[in-house]
């Protein structure tokens, strides 16, 4: 009998332990006992108890990408994502609640695509936690009921050009950080840029781009701002002028400030490298005592960002870590490629000389024009529309591809996309961008003819050409002029095929590339302006590097040093300027593309506005690619004459 009593007692004890454990687990899942809440790519949200990370993704979609995690004064959590919307989780909730509005939806012409625009900035009104503010890149929204309903904020003089990257609220004023326009003060009556003293890069004369404002805070009637790429912090006491704060920077190429939060007389600043504390009395920075505790919780898998719960010693803190590996260069067959461009004039007159340079210097990729700058197709493809346009040339492209493949060369087809003279002129200019003033086909530069990217026919035609090109044996399709026009009277452009007025230009480019990736059996890539590797311009010409990187295997920023403005990076000598421009272009483009696609920069191999032109100019560009974190690059010479590359590489 005593033995039986012991068994029953043991069962009761086990049951009690189990119930207690479930209670503790439930409390943990509600966020009560977690010290930190982190995002692990591919695994979701987890909570850290002090010894382990536990799942906390209940209610979240499967493959979301977190952008920001924040807590209000009551412990309610808010999670913003790249394309899955925004979620909320109060202390009493056992799962995340979707509080996204249909207003946040991505505008698309594709069937079966149902997702949200990236939430690029978020803030809670510190005086009223029911008031929430967020940005979907170029548009601001407000909720006055903790996210149950949302309304668009009308911004005077915005015109969808601002790309919002951070937000702070003080009374009736919204302070918004942007990708390249600096800091904007927004009220219902005015929109003002307050940029005297913030970090800038000058282009020509006084024309400049401001560094991306990655964080902003309004504390005790002062504004504090943090920046990307080692540009530190600024402070303003009058909301007009800015002074530099001496924030220690460990990595000048990539370190960014992502959170500025007050606690008593201390301001906590989290960068991608370190958590700092700034004493507002003695004006000194020091590494936070929390840093070593945080590092003990980190693992090889993450987290890449986390929220530190508030305590008696610190406020709630958001931390973003730059720890994701840029692995795609080594893990993909399209990575680690060093290419030369060859023009048809070179193929027809001295292809043997080109091949000698290619093989001697151990390049492993070649770019060849298929659909050229005028819409001519240099390949015997099958296309009813192309035949009607009379643009097909019967070249020996298959023999060229075969010869290159025999030497193990990766062969890339360059297809010019929306700049297409022959399609522009065909069918009575049916598919041309229109001039809303003259009521005729729009003309920018006289030698450039642009088709309307909003036209499904135009997009389908270019995808058809790419699919046919792939059948010839190419290894990759590279889309060039994958953008809207930049030169000429662009304010007169009328897009007759645009279905909705609030479509971002980047969204129609995304539609084209997402469809192309689904329909083309080989890797696809795009060329973008060099400045779009530096800043997230987004809606200006449609080349949003972060958004488009989701749909392509490789991106070619055109970072020719000669094409950056005469005032750009003049703090460096003429000799060092090519290296620094390419190095920082490499680091920035890898960062902005979220390390999910190969960055294969176009670099310069012809003498244009290059005072230090020569072999050293060539080699400094290559070193810039590598020192910026890249491995891949492509040399551009309009004729395909790479004799200077040959001289440079032979001298190494």
What role is predicted for each listed range?
Residues 552-566, 575-582, 588-652:
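Substrate-binding cleft of secreted/luminal carbohydrate-active enzymes
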Residues 34-38, 76-78, 87, 131-133, ...:
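Conserved beta-propeller blade signature
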Residues 30, 42, 57-72, 102-127, ...:
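Short coil-to-beta transitions that initiate beta-strands within beta-rich domains
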Residues 412-420, 478-481, 504-541, 596-607:
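Aromatic-lined carbohydrate-recognition surfaces of secreted/lumenal glycan-active proteins
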Residues 365-370, 396-443, 478-479:
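Glycine-rich, aromatic-flanked loop segments that form ligand/cofactor-binding clefts
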Residues 352-375, 471-476, 554, 628-632:
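Catalytic domains of carbohydrate-active enzymes, especially glycoside hydrolases
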Residues 332-346, 418-471:
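Active-site-adjacent "subsite" loops/lids of carbohydrate-active enzymes
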Residues 46-50, 88-90, 126, 143-144, ...:
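Conserved Ser/Thr-centered positions that define the repeating blades of beta-propeller domains
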């Amino acid at each position: 009998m005593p033995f039986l009593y012991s068994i029953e007692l043991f069962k009761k004890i086990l049951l009690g332990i189990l119930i207690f454990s479930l209670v503790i687990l439930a409390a943990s899942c509600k966020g009560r006992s977690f010290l930190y809440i982190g995002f692990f790519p591919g695994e979701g949200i987890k909570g850290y108890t002090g010894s382990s990370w536990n799942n906390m993704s209940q209610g979240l979609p499967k493959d979301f990408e977190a952008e920001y995690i924040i807590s209000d004064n009551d412990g309610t959590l808010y999670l913003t994502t790249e394309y899955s919307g925004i979620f909320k989780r109060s202390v009493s909730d056992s799962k995340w609640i979707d509080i996204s509005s249909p207003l946040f939806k991505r505008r698309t012409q594709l069937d079966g695509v149902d997702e949200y625009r990236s939430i690029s900035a978020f803030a809670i009104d510190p005086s009223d936690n029911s008031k929430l503010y967020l940005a979907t890149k170029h548009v601001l929204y407000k909720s006055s009921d903790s996210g149950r309903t949302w309304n668009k904020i009308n911004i005077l003089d915005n015109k969808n050009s601002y790309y919002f990257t951070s937000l702070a609220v003080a009374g009736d004023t919204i302070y918004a950080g942007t990708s390249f326009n600096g800091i904007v003060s927004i009220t219902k009556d005015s929109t003002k840029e307050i940029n005297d003293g913030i970090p800038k890069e000058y282009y020509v004369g006084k024309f400049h781009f401001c560094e991306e404002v990655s964080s902003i805070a309004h504390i005790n009637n002062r504004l504090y701002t943090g920046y990307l790429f080692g540009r530190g912090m600024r402070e303003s006491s009058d909301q007009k002028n800015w002074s530099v704060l001496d924030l220690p920077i460990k990595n000048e190429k990539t370190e960014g400030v992502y959170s500025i939060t007050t606690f008593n007389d201390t301001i906590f600043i989290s960068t991608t490298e370190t958590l700092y504390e700034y004493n507002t009395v003695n004006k000194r920075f020091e590494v936070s005592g929390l840093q070593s505790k945080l590092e003990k919780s980190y693992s090889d898998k993450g987290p890449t960002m986390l929220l530190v719960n508030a305590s008696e010693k610190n406020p709630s803190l958001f931390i973003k870590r730059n720890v994701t590996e840029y692995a795609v260069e080594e893990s993909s067959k399209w990575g680690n490629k060093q290419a030369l461009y060859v023009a048809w004039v070179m193929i027809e007159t001295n292809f043997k000389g080109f091949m000698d340079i290619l093989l001697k210097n151990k390049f492993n990729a070649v770019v060849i024009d298929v659909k050229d700058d005028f819409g001519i197709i240099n390949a015997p493809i099958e296309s009813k529309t192309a035949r009607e346009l009379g643009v097909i040339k019967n070249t020996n492209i298959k023999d060229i591809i075969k010869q290159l493949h025999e030497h193990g060369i990766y062969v890339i087809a360059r297809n010019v996309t929306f700049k297409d003279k022959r399609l522009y002129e065909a069918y009575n200019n049916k598919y041309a961008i229109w001039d809303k003033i003259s009521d005729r086909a729009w003309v920018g530069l006289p030698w450039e003819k642009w088709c309307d990217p909003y036209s499904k026919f135009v997009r389908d035609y270019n995808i058809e050409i790419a699919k046919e090109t792939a059948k010839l044996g190419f290894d990759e399709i590279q889309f060039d002029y994958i953008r809207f026009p930049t030169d000429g009277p662009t304010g007169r452009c009328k897009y007759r095929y645009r279905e909705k007025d609030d479509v971002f230009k980047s969204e129609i480019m995304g539609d084209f590339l997402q469809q192309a990736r689904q329909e083309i059996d080989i890797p696809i890539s795009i060329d973008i302006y060099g400045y779009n590797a530096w800043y997230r311009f987004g809606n200006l010409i449609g080349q949003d590097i972060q958004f488009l990187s989701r749909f392509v295997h490789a991106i070619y920023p055109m970072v020719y040093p000669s094409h950056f403005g005469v005032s750009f990076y003049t703090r460096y000598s003429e000799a060092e300027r090519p290296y620094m421009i390419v190095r920082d272009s490499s680091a920035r483009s890898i960062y902005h593309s979220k390390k999910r696609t190969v960055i294969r920069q176009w670099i310069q191999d012809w003498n244009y506005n290059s005072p230090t032109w020569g072999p050293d100019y060539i080699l400094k560009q290559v070193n810039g690619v590598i020192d910026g974190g890249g491995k891949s690059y492509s040399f551009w010479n309009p004729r395909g004459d790479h004799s200077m590359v040959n001289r440079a590489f032979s001298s190494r």
